[in-house]
Amino acid sequence: MTTILLKENEPFEVAIRRFRRAIEKNGLIAELRERQSYEKPTTARKRKKAAAVKRLHKRLRSQMLPKKLH
């Protein structure tokens, strides 16, 4: 469980912001989104494979040198 201690004279909004950052850092929000609905293992593998291919194409596109203009 993520907890934060309120500092003396700290506004509530600042404490909420610190709490949200702590939760985001722990990965709790991402885990909740994953567990929101069941995803079949085959679908998860397919999604991860597609993301890997997309990353590969993006990396290759950035490494390609532009053609020489004469």
From Swiss-Prot:
Disulfide bonds: none annotated. GO terms for biological process: translation. It holds the Pfam family Ribosomal_S21. Keywords: Ribonucleoprotein, Ribosomal protein. Coiled coil: none annotated. InterPro entries: Ribosomal_bS21, Ribosomal_bS21_sf. One of its GO terms (cellular component) is ribonucleoprotein complex. NCBIfam families: S21p. Belongs to the bacterial ribosomal protein bS21 family. This is Small ribosomal subunit protein bS21A. It comes from Paraburkholderia xenovorans (strain LB400). The lineage of its organism: Bacteria, Pseudomonadati, Pseudomonadota, Betaproteobacteria, Burkholderiales. The gene is rpsU1.
